[in-house]
Amino acid sequence: MLLRDLVLRRGCCWSSLLLHCALHPLWGFVQVTHGEPQKSCSKVTDSCRHVCQCRPPPPLPPPPPPPPPPRLLSAPAPNSTSCPTEESWWSGLVIIIAVCCASLVFLTVLVIICYKAIKRKPLRKDENGTSVAEYPMSASQSNKGVDVNNAVV
């Protein structure tokens, strides 16, 4: 609020504001370091004795008691001396085998796709500059002669 009033009344007072912000912490530091450390109450004047009283700080209050343990909503299980049942290791083995089989199938399909892509014949350039794949049907169709209806007279 005070800052807004200063800016509105004086227009642009950034230099004085920056000077104030820079010197304010320095002035506080000077005020704090101006006093001398006090060793005991025997060398204290009456004016200082009134301010500091030379008493030790009061003891800290005792810590609060720990919170009670949480209550269980369900009935507690009866204490049994029998050992807990061990989990079967077959389920983990089945999962590992299933993941390995799925990975093997995926890699096999990937190898087949790559093999077919590499084995495919490369494209050749046609007379008009377009790329045409060399498949048996396209090669036989491109070797046909000029049609009689398209002959130029």
Swiss-Prot record:
The gene is PRIMA1. It comes from the Eukaryota. It comes from Homo sapiens. InterPro entries: PRIMA1. It is found in: Cell membrane; Cell junction; Synapse. Glycans are attached at residue 79. Induction: By RAF1. Residues 56-70 form the PRAD domain. Changing residue 22 to V: In a colorectal cancer sample; somatic mutation. Keywords: Cell junction, Cell membrane, Disulfide bond, Glycoprotein, Membrane, Neurotransmitter degradation, Signal, Synapse, Transmembrane, Transmembrane helix. One of its GO terms (cellular component) is plasma membrane. Residues 59-79 are annotated as: Disordered. It holds the Pfam family PRIMA1. Its main location: membrane. Required to anchor acetylcholinesterase (ACHE) to the basal lamina of the neuromuscular junction and to the membrane of neuronal synapses in brain. Also able to organize ACHE into tetramers. Residues 36-92 are extracellular. This is Proline-rich membrane anchor 1. Residues 114-153 are cytoplasmic. Interacts with ACHE, probably through disulfide bonds. The proline-rich attachment domain (PRAD) binds the AChE catalytic subunits.
